[in-house]
């Protein structure tokens, strides 16, 4: 039947999700990203790989090159269902990013290509390659909760309880008026 991994890439500081970046079939994953910037900008990227364990017993690590410079990609967590990686880098001019598990030149015609124009807040899939890739913005709340807890602060847990107590008190006070 063939190997079918799943790969999602989250560009957290731009609130973008590159979804279904995996190939239709095959033990390779990656994409090319054209980044347009007008000033220095730091990017934080989270990769979520859901391996097809029925066909492989270990996954290839994700690697990244930005403007011909290697970027450290750190494995954050690994479970039976997924492997999560993260990477950060800064650029001060338009840049070309390669994300890959195998030689990106070999898969150039298969990996998707995306353009993200940061100043204009525009993005598009330039070439879908052999994927069903799409871009989601903003990042879905379920994905934020599951993978990006440290990147997005939803609430302050200490204040949640206080706010709830205040809500109940106000609600009960309003019932007294009737």
UniProtKB/Swiss-Prot annotation:
InterPro entries: Poxvirus_C7/F8A. One of its GO terms (biological process) is viral process. Transmembrane segments: none annotated. Plays a role for multiplication of the virus in different cell types. Belongs to the poxviridae C7 protein family. This is Probable host range protein 2. It comes from Yaba-like disease virus (YLDV).
